[in-house]
Amino acid sequence: MTNAARPELDLLANRRAVETCLEGFLVGKQRAAAEHCMPAEVVQTLRNFVFAGGKRLRPLLCICGWYAGGGAGDMAAVVQAAASLEMFHAFALIHDDLMDHSDTRRGKPTVHRSLAAHHSALRGQEAASHLGTGGAILVGDLALAWSDELLHTAGLTPDRLAAVLPVIDGMRTEVMYGQYLDLCAAGDPTLDLDAALTVARYKTAKYTCERPLHIGASLAGAGLAVLEACTAYALPLGEAFQLRDDLLGVYGAPEQTGKPVLDDLRGAKHTVLLALALQRADAAQRKVLHLLLGNPGLDEHDAVRIRGILTATGARAEVERLIRNRHAQAHQALDQASFPPSTARTLRRIADAATVRAA
């Protein structure tokens, strides 16, 4: 089949295929836990978390990468490899919520809060909270281990598995470093825009967009030119995705984002948005920002004051400009790429949806 004759890449059908794979895998794990008299809440908590929502962006980009690299034929192994990325994402989010002391994710209690609530009646609040913390670490670790299992049982040929493992290893290393950078920067927002962009690139851009595309393309046996074209599209898109997240963390509607709108301000996240505001603020505005950012007792009245400064300094408008710029860069990269036309069209739709969103 020529590139021009390829059918349109059906994102909805591929998303359903990934979710069917995840559901079957986790149902099997629940059965195994029951057979061995393991605590039922462990797998159930992870299953609830995985299916509480989410865009499935990483597995979908993995599948797009496979098509971009010229993949053809049976997709079962590719879908399961893509599903392994969603399981890895669950691991990353569970631990991220714990580090950020977040109460909700996707409108539901975070894993550590859910496990604490499960045990609170019998153990008391303090003991249940401690168990929730330790339990969330273990559930996250289990998701990491199971992402490996999904990959290694996908039925990939030895050469394809050998091609993709270094990419996955690189992705995992980048995520850990990005998360550590984010941890170190939290609570101490500075004027350092480059540092904020570095966190965005390693914590989100590479892991969310670039590496999933690389993994899919590697599964198709793609060469260096395809991988470089994936990077040219994915890095600006991933940065735009994170910049939109930063805006939603301050201005978003909790009923749409599924997260409290005050968390990023209480945590004084070292985002591009806050770095720009601190750069542009006058002495009085900077004093207010340093007074309020990072205050665990910050309330909506305080948040209104901060939002006013972000708008008055032009920081919010500048982040919107950066998003538009990176969105355009992603589209321009597709103009230069030799991807099948149907794949390029799908990647354009993904870029549009990832950067103009309310959740």
Residue ranges, per PLM feature:
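All-alpha prenyltransferase/terpene-synthase fold signal
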Residues: 1-359
